[in-house]
Amino acid sequence: MEGLTLSDAEQKYYSDLFSYCDIESTKKVVVNGRVLELFRAAQLPNDVVLQIMELCGATRLGYFGRSQFYIALKLVAVAQSGFPLRVESINTVKDLPLPRFVASKNEQESRLAASYSSDSENQGSYSGVIPPPPGRGQVKKGPGSHDAVQPRPSAEQQEPVSPVVSPQQSPPTSPHTWRKHSRHPSGGNSERPLTGPGPFWSPFGDAQAGSSAGDAVWSGQSPPPPQDNWVSFADTPPTSALLTMHPASVQDQTTVRTVASAATANEIRRQSSSYEDPWKITDEQRQYYVNQFKTIQPDLNGFIPGSAAKEFFTKSKLPILELSHIWELSDFDKDGALTLDEFCAAFHLVVARKNGYDLPEKLPESLMPKLIDLEDSADVGEQPGEVGYSGSPAEAPPSKSPSMPSLNQTWPELNQSSEQWETFSERSSSSQTLTQFDSNIAPADPDTAIVHPVPIRMTPSKIHMQEMELKRTSSDHTNPTSPLLVKPSDLSEENKINSSVKFPSGNTVDGYSSSDSFPSDPEQIGSSVTRQRSHSGTSPDNTAPPPPPPRPQPSHSRSSSLDMNRTFAVTTGQQQAGVVAHPPAVPPRPQPSQAPGPSVHRPVDADGLITHTSTSPQQIPEQPNFADFSQFEVFAASNVSEEQDSEAEKHPEVLPAEKASDPSSSLRAAQADSKAEEKTATNVPANVSKGTTPLAPPPKPVRRRLKSEDELRPDVDEHTQKTGVLAAVLTSQPSIPRSVGKDKKAIQASIRRNKETNTVLARLNSELQQQLKDVLEERISLEVQLEQLRPFSHL
């Protein structure tokens, strides 16, 4: 042990004393535990004790190991023998007597009584008694409680120096553990020895004459005035009773700093103290808590938000984890704020923890809101609370003024801005906000509906969807084809049509057909649902309809007129505009064209087609959609080759797809019907007028028939009707072989162009839909991030 030589007697004596001081059997004795009592019992001045602690190395380490403890005892013996206090003296001084520790007569009697009561440290009612030096054969390792804390004379203890805010009549039975904070090597209030009955050791500073008689009071026992007042004994029972009421001694109070020692102290308090419920709040404590509550929240019926509570309780300097646990216990309703009752419970727990009490796993019943018993002032009261006000501040600075107007002043202004605390202080409310942010957004406009197809699978804000809906309605007032309104069957039907028409990715991007992007103007068409979604309806507004089929001014928001303009020459648009000017009155023609056309985008069209055969009025308004091919023939003859070449270059892959679909028997039948119908149509207008020639239908009708390939199966009856009508028309109309060949070529060319145009538009629509989808997803993610960044904004 660093060259320390001990005799057998010293070895045994020091070993017994070390075991006596090492309550937790950790081989590390805290500096201000029983060791402090031992040194005080040696009746050495404060400066000598501090010097001994420095020399042995305990001050540097913060605890006494066995070697430091033995050296300290050796130095105590050196000091008591009057030799110079140096480390060298422990080996140079010969025949050094064992260190002497003075115990009063009362203490010895108490020790004797304790031996009869219990050998357990936890039950030592006379824990304030420290056994005499083991060398004299009186050493008891852990007899009763080892603490030297003795009750003070009631006269002294009734000093009127109570804290400004702290009640003066704190529970008389609160153990001295509440005043553990004052026991520092500094010696506390050594200048105020309380002479009274009971075995007290002389203070560090001066060995008093009465100390030999047992009247010397351990100065540390009377720490800062706040503790004296806080634990005022104005109405306490006699000193004899006090002996049994103060089980926790210096040892408990100091070792309480560790978790294990805290558990021991609590056990001692539970078993040896006379108070009933340590968690009950007395009237005095309640009043103090209420006053503190008012400093934060003047309205007693109000509540203190988590942020304010955090700022207040952080001043207690308790670890963040403990404060978090206290918050979880006290925030009974988990609303992120503290009511008055919850605040009192939290304050009580903080005070208790500051005084060495373990925090309970669950909130004690006496602290639960609406169950707090505040009328037990006559009861022995709850220790945690009393000393918490004055004692807790004294822990760090023992010299703090006794007056404690508020915890804000007494507790060091140390706001531990820890995220851990922040999470605990506002966890309950923030967690709800984060998990339910969607519901917070939704109420923005409950009347609006999510209209855009993409958001159907997502959850965009309704405000954004409302804007989109307004745009849609501006273009399609009567359009019942919004994604939300389309029936699943319609969607599947449209998907079929799209696949048959070879719209690769355009129509099914969002899980619904691209019919949305091909709406002809339902406003003008009225109830003609069949032509509502004509295949080439992508032409947005009447400004620039697709060349072959001039659109009637649908003003569709999703159409891409600019692209169409680029694709087709301006002359085409001009001709079509002219064609639109005079709608050809060809009732029979719309019937065949409508049959396939509606099928392209609406399953309802199948039914509508059948009825449309008889409802020519509906078809009439649609006529403007059909180009007047009597005029178009000339243009087709000249520009067919050019447009075909250009379209083939732009979309070479479309043509094979279209051709691939032609071989199907159903498509061929449809085309044959359309061609025959077109021929007859051309003949019919010849009789009437060249402008009304039904040549215009070919492009769209043919496309419709192609699209309706899937629907042709369910519309077999309709098909037969159309064939019958065509046959009748053919028989009634004289054939014009001269124009038939020309018409065929023109019609086929226009069909190809329309197909290509439709494919281009479908692909463009698909791309635009995908872009919109991506933008919406990005918007949603940004909204989510925004919500996550402001969960605590309400506090």
UniProtKB/Swiss-Prot annotation:
Modified residues (Phosphothreonine): T173, T543
Chief localization: membrane
One Gene Ontology cellular component annotation held by this UniProt entry: cytosol
Keywords: Calcium, Coated pit, Coiled coil, Membrane, Metal-binding, Phosphoprotein, Repeat
Xref: SUPFAM superfamilies: EF-hand (SSF47473)
Entry's Gene Ontology molecular function annotations: calcium ion binding; SH3 domain binding
Subcellular location: Membrane, Clathrin-coated pit
Residues that bind Ca(2+): D331, D333, D335, E342
Coiled-coil region: 750-790
Compositionally skewed regions (Basic and acidic residues) per UniProt: 707-720
Low complexity bias spans: 156-168, 205-216, 574-583
Start and end residues of each stretch annotated as Interaction with RALBP1: 651-795
Tissue distribution: Expressed in all tissues examined. The highest level expression was found in the kidney and testis.
Domain EH, first and last residues per copy: 10-113, 285-374
Positions of the UniProt region annotated as Disordered: 112-238, 380-433, 469-720
Gene3D superfamilies: EF-hand (1.10.238.10)
Phosphotyrosine PTM positions: Y288
Modified residues (Phosphoserine): S145, S162, S166, S170, S272, S273, S307, S475, S482, S489, S539, S561, S708, S739
Biased composition (Pro residues): 543-553, 584-595
Composition bias, Polar residues: 115-126, 407-433, 497-518, 525-542, 562-573, 611-622, 681-692
Pfam family, one: EH
Self-association state and partner proteins as the record states: Homodimer (Potential). Interacts with RALBP1, CRK and GRB2. Binding to RALBP1 does not affect its Ral-binding activity. Forms a complex with the SH3 domains of CRK and GRB2 which may link it to an EGF-responsive tyrosine kinase. Interacts with RAB11FIP2. Interacts with AMPH, ITSN1 (via SH3 domains) and SGIP1; may be involved in clathrin-mediated endocytosis.
Protein name as it appears in the record: RalBP1-associated Eps domain-containing protein 1
Organism of this sequence: Mus musculus
Taxonomy of the source species: Eukaryota, Metazoa, Chordata, Craniata, Vertebrata
Gene: Reps1
